[in-house]
């Protein structure tokens, strides 16, 4: 799974493939809990599977915070043809879980 830097997003967005990006921060305990779930899914999900990416947005200066209106981490955003087709924002005090990932994958696969 690729770790996207801000300057690599345009290449990812210009791809015709569906992409699922997890935005996270190393200091976030909910991200540390969710990251293995995301990685396991990236390694096992096969049906019309989107390409999985992660993007570490530790720094407040990272332009992706504002560009994608990220207010909590982890946040998972699904893209197709450069457009956002679905997203899940981390819930305060909870983060994201396996059911959140499963629901965004289902939505991503049904978006055609």
What are these regions (language model features)?
Residues 2-4, 23, 35, 42, ...:
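Thiol-based oxidoreductase modules, predominantly thioredoxin-like and allied folds used
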Residues 8-43:
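Local sequence-structure signature of Cys/Sec-based thiol-disulfide redox active-site neighborhoods
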Residues 9-10, 62-65:
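Short hydrophobic/charged patches on amphipathic alpha-helices used for structural packing
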Residues 17-19, 48, 72-75:
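Core residues of folded domains in eukaryotic genome-function proteins
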Residues 20-21, 38, 52, 76-78, ...:
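Structural signal for hydrophobic/aromatic residues that build the beta-strand cores
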Residues 27, 49, 78:
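Short aromatic-centered micro-motifs
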Residues 66-71:
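A short glycine-leucine-enriched loop at secondary-structure breakpoints
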Residues 72, 77-112:
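Non-catalytic, surface beta->alpha helical segment in thiol-disulfide oxidoreductase systems
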């Amino acid at each position: 799974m690729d770790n996207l830097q801000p300057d690599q997003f345009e290449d990812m967005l210009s791809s015709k493939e569906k992409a699922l990006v997890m935005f996270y921060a190393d200091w976030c305990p909910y991200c540390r809990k969710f990251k293995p779930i995301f990685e396991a899914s990236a390694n096992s999900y096969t049906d019309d599977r989107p390409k999985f990416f992660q993007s570490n947005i530790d720094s407040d200066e990272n332009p992706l915070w504002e560009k994608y209106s990220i207010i909590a981490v982890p946040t998972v955003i699904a893209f197709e043809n450069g457009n956002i087709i679905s997203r899940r924002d981390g819930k305060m005090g909870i983060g994201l879980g396996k059911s959140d990932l499963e629901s965004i994958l289902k939505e991503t696969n049904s978006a055609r």
